[in-house]
């Protein structure tokens, strides 16, 4: 036997060296360039039935080294390349012997070859492990181009209408050096593209995965920026000033000091174009179009970052503080038409027109800290202090009519003038301590929210009865102080029981203590019927148990939440003085399955069961008579709602076909729904609204997204949705009816948008068409059956010539099937802009025109089983404007 073994060893020695240190390097089979970050897995047989192995990562020169002896099976892999296997045998009595197995060549996959494009001799991107590294110098950009122009050219990256970034259909966030970017995504429009050395795209693992090495299913897709050293610790920003016809202006300044240690943010805004823009640390909110208005605001922020080394790990920490002051004025004219369905063919109609004006002063302070004292502990603190002072005025006229068989006959009119004053102070804070150990983590955290507010209202009502031709006047005054306290301590434990099975447990306590008082007077006399005292206490305990189970490419995540809740409400109003106590226990299971078919394909299945309880106040038999023509009341017989929801999604990106597909299907069923039910008394023209429980809804939705690149210049996009459901509501009840009549509403809602895009050299163009239909059918009010159409089609065009950019967009909106003739119309919206880039692209002058044909009417409609509404309001449109923007660029050091 010994002689046989010796012979075998001699034979093997002719082919292999004797060593227990294996080294080599990984290179590209075509370019012979090294591949840093390649994964080298080795598996060694110990006995006939047992194996051991590990993984090493190639260094910055593509080299790798590991210790072993005996027969070893190697498998080398890298994202974008085909895997390669190699068998090696190391036999040695010395720990100093080294076997250099030379270069292992990987061939780039056909999919990656389709994605790689070369400008000149520079690669647009390279692969480092699972990270794609983009080279900005390989992209064709104009001098002075901003970072956002570069990012939008990255293969697989898209920006939606709100500016949110997506990578192959997944939302992404920007980081710098692996840490969150101070200034957020707003910074990308200010930073020059030349300041970026490279951009890395990768899935950032959760801290738990970084510590344990096991996939917990939580990861973020990030674009990580590496800034050239000469561009750090410098100021960047934009300054914009503009004018629109009819004496409207807008101006803002956004400045950011880009730094890895001490970034600073400064923002200022002034406009009267109804734009609302707030910027703080980690927050950026912008909205427009809600009526008319003006705003002036200023804010700033500072962050200090520091790090230290512990072993082979870098511990990054920071603290930040930001704050601002905003002054906001809003005003608008608006209107609403409402039809309430009665049993049979009859119905009522009301038309409301109004004018609202509000004023608000809003100072805000935020603070945040993330501290890593060592590699196993992380402490996080966050707090926000916000105060609002507001005042408002409004005028509202409502005319009610009833169906007389020959059209609507007006019955009563109410004019309401309201003056309001108030203030609110809110403190929100949260914190956590997370400790990581070998196979899991322990997190202890909590939050506190406290709100103190007080409002005052002066209300004058004039009610005119057309039948008696009599008018009455009411003067009302209400003072309403309130406070809310919410405490939310929690503890979370996560433990990998094995390499493929993680157990997680979570406990959360919710404590609420709310107080609302209202003192109400009518014509100077205390009005007990509309004054109340409301005390609400709630304590809830929630224990959630879940698992993460990894089986190959499949991940299972079962979970169940057990909640016990006790509510206590003391409510006093007029003759009603009651105490309501409700204790409930509920179980809410959920299940999630994720199958990563490939790196670019995944299937996800979800199931959840939820219980929704009506507010405790809704279950008290109170009556609110503050509006004499519209009374609200509670209902002690409301039921809980239980909802089952099933969802399946499939996402795939096929680079070789330039194709992205997303499919989603969802079905939801609820046993009970709580809706508002109306009663109407023709003798007094008074409506009463009361919550009622009705049979639950059934809803379904199917969505298919298709994005296909056709050659180098064309792109086809299609977004198909099919939605439907069954809902219930009560018809408006009359005194002559002994019981409410249930009305079933069914809906089938197909929606499809097809877009063809062209992008080549200096021209970008798109044509699109959207079909949007909603087929509504009612069991007890069949005269309301209709099919609503909201179709649109149009085109957009952009041309770049030297320093000029010309854009135009034309969209035709078509509405049909509505009861209101004002809704059934076609609107043609047309906009044009010309931008002139000056000062070596550091500045631009823009001339623009919006809604040239004056067609935008800002109308919308909604329809339910018991009511239909049509609404409209003022908005800023049909104007010509000019603006100038200057980019502040720092010179390199």
Question: Model-predicted segments: where are they?
Answer:
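Conserved C-terminal beta-signal and adjacent last beta-strands/turns
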Residues: 751-773, 785-893
């Amino acid at each position: 036997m010994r002689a046989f073994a010796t012979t075998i060893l001699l034979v093997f020695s002719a082919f292999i060296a004797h060593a227990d240190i294996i080294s080599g390097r990984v290179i590209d089979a075509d370019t012979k360039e090294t591949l840093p970050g390649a994964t080298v897995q080795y598996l060694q047989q110990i006995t006939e039935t047992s194996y051991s192995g590990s993984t090493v990562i190639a260094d910055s020169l593509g080299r790798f080294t590991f210790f072993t002896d005996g027969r070893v099976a190697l498998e080398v892999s890298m994202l974008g390349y085909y895997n390669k296997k190699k068998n090696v045998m190391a036999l040695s009595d010395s720990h100093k012997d080294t076997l250099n197995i030379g270069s292992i060549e990987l061939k780039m996959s056909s999919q990656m070859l389709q994605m790689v494009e070369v400008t000149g001799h520079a690669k647009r991107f390279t692969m480092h492990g699972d990270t794609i590294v983009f080279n900005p110098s390989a992209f064709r950009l104009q001098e002075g181009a901003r970072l956002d122009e570069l990012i939008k050219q990255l293969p697989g990256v898209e920006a939606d209408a709100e500016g949110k970034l997506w990578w192959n259909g997944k939302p992404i966030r920007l980081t710098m050096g692996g840490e969150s970017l101070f200034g957020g995504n707003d910074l990308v429009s200010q930073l020059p593209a030349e300041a970026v050395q490279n951009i890395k795209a990768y899935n950032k693992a959760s801290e738990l995965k970084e510590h344990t090495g096991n996939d917990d299913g939580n990861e973020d897709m990030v674009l990580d920026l590496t800034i050239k050293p000469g561009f750090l610790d410098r100021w960047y920003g934009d300054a914009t000033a503009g004018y629109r016809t009819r004496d409207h202006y807008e101006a803002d300044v956004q400045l950011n000091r880009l730094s890895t240690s001490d970034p600073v943010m400064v923002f200022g805004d002034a406009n009267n174009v109804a734009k609302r823009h707030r910027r703080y640390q980690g927050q950026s909110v912008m909205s427009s179009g809600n009526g008319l208005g003006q705003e002036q605001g200023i804010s700033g922020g500072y962050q200090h970052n520091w790090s230290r080394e512990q072993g082979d790990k870098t511990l990054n920490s920071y603290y930040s503080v930001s704050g601002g002051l905003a002054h906001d004025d809003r005003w608008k004219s608006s209107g609403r038409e409402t039809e309430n369905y009665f049993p049979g063919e009859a119905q009522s109609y009301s038309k409301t027109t109004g004018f609202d004006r509000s004023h608000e002063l809003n100072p805000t302070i935020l603070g945040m800290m993330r501290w890593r004292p060592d590699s196993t502990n992380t402490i996080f603190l966050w707090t926000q202090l916000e105060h609002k002072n507001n005042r408002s005025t409004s005028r509202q006229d409502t005319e009610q009519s009833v169906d007389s068989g020959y059209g609507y006959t007006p019955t009563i009119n109410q004019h309401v003038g309201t003056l309001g004053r108030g203030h609110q102070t809110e403190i929100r804070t949260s914190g956590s301590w997370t400790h990581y150990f070998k196979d899991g983590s322990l997190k202890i955290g909590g939050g506190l929210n406290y709100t103190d507010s007080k409002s005052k209202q002066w209300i004058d009502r004039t009610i005119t009865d057309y039948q008696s031709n009599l008018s009455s006047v009411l003067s009302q005054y209400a003072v309403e102080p309130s406070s809310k306290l919410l405490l939310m301590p929690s503890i979370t434990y996560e433990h990998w029981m094995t390499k493929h099975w993680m157990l997680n447990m979570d406990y959360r306590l919710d404590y609420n203590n709310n107080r609302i008082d209202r003192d109400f007077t009518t014509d100077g006399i205390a009005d007990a019927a509309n004054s109340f005292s409301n005390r609400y206490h709630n304590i809830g305990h929630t224990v959630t148990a879940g698992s993460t189970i990894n089986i190959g490419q499949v991940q299972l995540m079962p979970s169940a939440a057990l909640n016990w809740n006790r509510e206590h409400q003391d409510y006093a109003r007029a003759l009603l003085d009651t105490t309501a106590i409700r204790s409930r226990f509920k179980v809410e299971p959920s299940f999630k399955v994720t199958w990563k078919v490939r790196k670019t394909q995944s299937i996800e299945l979800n199931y959840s069961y939820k219980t929704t309880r009506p507010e405790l106040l809704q279950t008290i038999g109170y009556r609110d008579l503050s509006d004499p023509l519209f009374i609200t009341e509670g209902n002690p017989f409301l039921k809980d709602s239980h909802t089952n929801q099933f969802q399946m999604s499939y996402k795939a990106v096929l680079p070789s076909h330039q194709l992205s597909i997303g499919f989603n299907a969802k079905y939801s069923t609820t046993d009970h729904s709580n809706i508002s039910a109306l009663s109407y008394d023709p003798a007094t023209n008074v409506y009463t609204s009361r919550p009622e429980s009705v049979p639950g809804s059934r809803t379904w939705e199917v969505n298919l997204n298709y994005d296909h690149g056709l050659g180098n210049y064309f792109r086809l996009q299609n977004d198909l949705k099919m939605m439907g459901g069954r809902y219930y509501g009560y018809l408006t009840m009359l005194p002559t009816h002994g019981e409410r009549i249930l009305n079933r509403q069914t809906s089938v809602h197909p929606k499809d948008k097809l877009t063809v895009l062209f992008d080549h050299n200096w021209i970008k163009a798109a044509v699109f068409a959207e079909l949007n239909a909603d087929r509504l059918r009612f069991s007890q009010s069949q005269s309301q059956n209709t099919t609503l159409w909201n179709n649109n089609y149009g085109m957009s065009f952009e041309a770049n010539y030297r320093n000029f950019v010309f854009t135009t967009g034309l969209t035709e909106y078509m509405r049909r099937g509505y009861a209101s003739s004002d809704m059934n119309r076609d609107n043609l919206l047309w906009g044009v802009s010309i931008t002139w880039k000056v000062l070596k692209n550091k500045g631009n002058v823009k001339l623009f025109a919006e809604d040239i044909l004056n067609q935008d009417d800002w109308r919308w409609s909604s329809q339910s089983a018991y009511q239909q509404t049509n609404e409209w309001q003022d908005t800023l449109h049909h104007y010509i404007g000019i603006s100038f923007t200057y980019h502040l660029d720092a010179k390199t050091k």
